[in-house]
From Swiss-Prot:
Residues 1-29 form the signal peptide. It is found in: Membrane. Keywords: Membrane, Signal, Transmembrane, Transmembrane helix. The chain crosses the membrane at residues 34-54, 56-76. Partially overlaps WHI5. It is a multi-pass membrane protein. GO terms for cellular component: membrane. This is Putative uncharacterized protein YOR082C. Its main location: membrane. It comes from Saccharomyces cerevisiae (strain ATCC 204508 / S288c) (Baker's yeast).
Length: 113
C-alpha cells in the first residue's frame, strides 16, 4: 500500500513538472501554431485530474471499504459461531479434544480402561 502511495506521489510530481515547465506557460501556447502542444496540455490536465481522483479513491474509499469488509466478516464469524452453537456437529473440531478422545478410544480398544 505504501509503495502504491509513493508511486502516486511520484506520478503527481512528474506530471506537475511536465505541466508547468513545458506546457503551461501561456507564451509557448500563444507562439505554438500546432495543436499538438495544446492537446498535450489538455491531456496532462486530464491525467492529473484522473490521478487526483484515483488518489481520493485510494485514500478515502479503500480504507472505508476495508473497514466495512472487516465488520462484515467479524459479524459474519460471530453469526457462524452462534449458528454452530445452536446446531453442534457430531464431531469436535477442536484439535485437543479430538486428540484426547482418540487417546481414550485407543486405550479402550487395548482394554486398559
Amino acid at each position: 500500500m505504501l509503495v502504491v502511495y509513493m508511486c502516486i506521489w511520484v506520478l503527481y510530481l512528474l506530471l506537475f513538472l511536465f505541466l508547468f515547465l513545458f506546457i503551461a506557460s501561456p507564451a509557448s501556447l500563444r507562439r505554438s501554431q500546432t495543436h499538438i502542444l495544446q492537446c498535450l496540455y489538455y491531456f496532462s490536465l486530464l491525467l492529473i485530474s484522473g490521478c487526483a481522483f484515483f488518489h481520493q479513491v485510494l485514500c478515502l474509499v479503500l480504507p472505508l471499504f476495508c473497514f466495512v469488509l472487516f465488520c462484515f466478516f467479524y459479524f459474519f464469524r460471530s453469526a457462524l459461531e452462534v449458528f454452530a452453537s445452536l446446531f453442534p456437529l457430531p464431531f469436535s473440531t477442536r484439535s485437543h479434544e479430538t486428540i484426547s478422545k482418540s487417546r481414550i478410544i485407543i486405550k479402550a480398544a487395548r482394554g486398559i480402561i
